[in-house]
Amino acid sequence: MIRQRTLKNTIRATGVGLHSGEKVYLTLKPAPVDTGIVFRRADLDPVVEIPARAANVGETTMSTTLVNGDVKVDTVEHLLSAMAGLGIDNAYVELSASEVPIMDGSAGPFVFLIQSAGLEEQDAAKKFIRILREVTVEEGDKRATFLPFEGFKVSFEIDFDHPVLKGQTQSAVVDFSSTSFVKEVSRARTFGFMRDIEYLRKHNLALGGSVENAIVVDETGVLNEDGLRSEDEFVKHKILDAIGDLYLLGNSLIGEFKGYKSGHALNNQLLRKLIAETDAWEVVTFEDASTAPISYMRPVAAV
């Protein structure tokens, strides 16, 4: 049987919030079967919990924000992408501030943290959401779609009217039956344009942003000394974001996601539409792992 997974051990890290610029302590903890991923604002008394579910998404400007009343957790998508990529079903994410630390702008440091904590299989079947028919949302020329597919595939196309991105690969397809999330997607960093930074900072966004945790682009090129990690890093990061946003369904997906210029807002609209259209999906488990269209790396022992 494909089993649910949690962390073997508790692990901690420190970083800064991309948008808030605040120092934040992050603690990842094991959680019981059927808990899901739950964020905890440990700096508040009493502690406030926010389950990582599509219905709890509040703000989607520049990142995905979860809310519970007037309490929020910003920029959850990169950590959730790492959880999805490693097949973690159940975990507590404790934070000392209102934003997940940005680390290096990718999911790579979170993958390392989770692997360092070790993965533990639990005594319950992992639940997948299988897409049964097409579901699409559109906004202007932006589009996000779910399609049936025996496995998990993400295809994405971006179209930035910017001289630097015009010369870069702007579309990618990742079929996770043959491609490793860790190798192909997890290290793609978030990116930002110099021309937008003044506006963002005026609106209290990107206060913690720098070439240490983002690809920074001006009209002539990439400002990061070491350049890009891959020529398709921009579009691969959009795939990373989408995987994190999609994990707000609360389960791993069996299906295909297609995004055209989609972002956090449209991704969330697609999830809400899918959840509402109950004939478009079903929950499945696999007693025999060999019959499953998706496989996960074997749990690694904690280092």
UniProtKB/Swiss-Prot annotation:
Top-level taxonomic group: Bacteria
Biological process according to GO: lipid A biosynthetic process
Cofactor: Zn(2+)
Record GO terms (molecular function): metal ion binding; UDP-3-O-acyl-N-acetylglucosamine deacetylase activity
Catalytic function, reaction form: a UDP-3-O-[(3R)-3-hydroxyacyl]-N-acetyl-alpha-D-glucosamine + H2O = a UDP-3-O-[(3R)-3-hydroxyacyl]-alpha-D-glucosamine + acetate
Coiled coil: none
Active site annotation, chain numbering: 264 (proton donor)
A cellular-component GO term for this protein: membrane
Entry EC number(s): 3.5.1.108
Pathway: Glycolipid biosynthesis; lipid IV(A) biosynthesis; lipid IV(A) from (3R)-3-hydroxytetradecanoyl-[acyl-carrier-protein] and UDP-N-acetyl-alpha-D-glucosamine: step 2/6
Residues binding Zn(2+), per UniProt: 78, 237, 241
NCBIfam families tied to this protein: lpxC (TIGR00325)
Family label: Belongs to the LpxC family.
Chain's role: Catalyzes the hydrolysis of UDP-3-O-myristoyl-N-acetylglucosamine to form UDP-3-O-myristoylglucosamine and acetate, the committed step in lipid A biosynthesis.
Protein name stated in the entry: UDP-3-O-acyl-N-acetylglucosamine deacetylase
Organism: Pseudomonas putida (strain W619)
